[in-house]
Amino acid sequence: MCEEVLLNDIWSFYFHDPYDSKWTYESYNKICDLSSAQEFWGLTDLIKEKIQFGMFFLMREHVFPCWDDENNKVGGCVSIKVLKNDVVQFWEELCIRVLGETLLTEKYKQLWNFVNGISTSPKKHFCIIKLWIKTQDLSLKDCFNLPKYYHGEVVYRSNQESIDTDHLKNN
């Protein structure tokens, strides 16, 4: 039996139905908490083929996957477009870099605690993978060691901008 490899933080894994238009706490399903590499690989085996069809969130335990969470409000999301054929591998490699704390480049690694999580959002022929960031200090593509197979530009959007846009749309 292998020795358990503990993560430096506990990470929570959520699912949100892509067809559910409600974005309330109740509309998210918390699947589990992960505290070891072995737990991550067990979960990965279960969801691997589903990752391109659902909205999944891997977040630090104390961070809820919504823009207006106290840990997300002043930060934003870095969005990466990944073609459907590459989503499973990209998601897996990105998760490994997040959980292993190797996502940030050398210049920015001291800001590691500002990485709140990652998520996936399915579209027709691709998925949008988002990095959830606590601060706008990590808004540049150069901050991250990203897997190479993504499509198009890496785009940052502040969560406050998303909150404001959503508020205008609903009023």
Which residues make up each language-model segment?
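RNA-binding basic/glycine-rich loop and surface signature characteristic of RAMP-family CRISPR effectors
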Residues: M1-E4, S35, G42
